[in-house]
Amino acid sequence: MAHGLPDYGANTPKVTVYGLSDMAELAVRLGSFVSYDRQGDVMCLDGFESGLRGFLTGGDGLGNSVTQDSTYSRNGAFSAKMVCGSTLGRSATLNKFLQYPVMGNLGIEFSSTMHADIETLKVSAAIYDGTNSFIARLIYNEDTSILTYLNSAGAEVPLQAGLVLEEHPYLFHTLKYVVDYKNRKYVRAMLDERSWDMTDIPLYSTLSANPPNMLIAIGAIGKIAVNAAIHVDDFIITQNEP
């Protein structure tokens, strides 16, 4: 979110209250769920209050589903409940298609609960230009407590080990990462209170004839023979990130 001009009224001393010096703070106080990092200009945001009509859902295995759910949420009354299949690929997916963006620094953010029966949780941001695809992906492995990223060779490279996330249905962990699609490189990543500098790490690219568009894909894989479930909320895509 652009922070705008200063609130010049804050320069005048007040007896009982303090003036605001940041428009992002004002937006949050008025009820926006863009409350985690607050940088960049919002392209798309969804708290699933109106259902999942703007998303393509899917999965693999017996019992997989992705639905609007009112049991747990980070903000508002609803979230997206992702139930992984218990057989075959054991997955649940939540995909968002967007128009081909102006090339620059784009941010991808969402919040999710964690569960002991989840094996991996990943988010991919792919841009297709009609000839190639450029993919930025982060993967969290619940079993090993390692956060990895997809490198230019298509391999998963550790970004942080020993990253244990509390498993509680009312606790949503927030993940955000920024990608420089103009220069095809990662910029930075954040998970809760931690952050990592990913400057100059190149993206994975491959040939693709898909027409120009952008795809954000959130995917969870559960353990064998159980229908592992997590809740996802506060999906945010930003542009003009620093």
Model feature map: region roles:
Residues T199-D233:
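Flexible glycan-contacting loops in extracellular carbohydrate-active proteins
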Residues L52-L88:
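Extracellular glycan-recognition surfaces and repeat-rich motifs
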Residues F48, I230-I237:
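Extracellular beta-strand elements of beta-rich domains used
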Residues F33, L94-Y100, Q160-E167:
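Beta-strand-rich interaction surfaces with strong enrichment in secreted/lumenal proteins
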